[in-house]
Curated annotation (Swiss-Prot):
Disulfide bond sites: none
Domain spans labelled Sm: 10-69
Record key words, sorted: RNA-binding, Stress response
Keyword RNA-binding on entry: yes
Record's protein name: RNA-binding protein Hfq
Pfam annotation, one family: Hfq
CDD domains: Hfq
Superkingdom of this protein's organism: Bacteria
Molecular function per GO: RNA binding
Length: 78
């Protein structure tokens, strides 16, 4: 993945993780997963609900937070 993609993706996922924001993750096959982002790396997102699921990023279509996320604060920290 290019650095430009990482400049948006990492701060967004990190804000979701840090603020414990509930998310809906839609996969490319249409399945909807719900939970909180526990952790992530270059290839996977750990999504915690009643269990922790490892979701491969290449299978993710959309990440929808349950509430607005402030990325300005996250970008200022970098």
């Amino acid at each position: 993945m290019s650095n430009k993609g990482q400049l948006l993706q990492d701060p967004f996922l990190n804000a979701l993780r840090r603020e414990h924001v509930p998310v809906s993750i839609y996969l490319v096959n249409g399945i909807k997963l719900q939970g909180q982002v526990e952790s992530f790396d270059q290839y996977v997102v750990l999504l915690k609900n009643t269990v922790t699921q490892m979701v491969y990023k290449h299978a993710i279509s959309t990440v929808v937070p349950a509430r607005p996320v402030n990325l300005q604060q996250e970008q200022a920290a970098e």
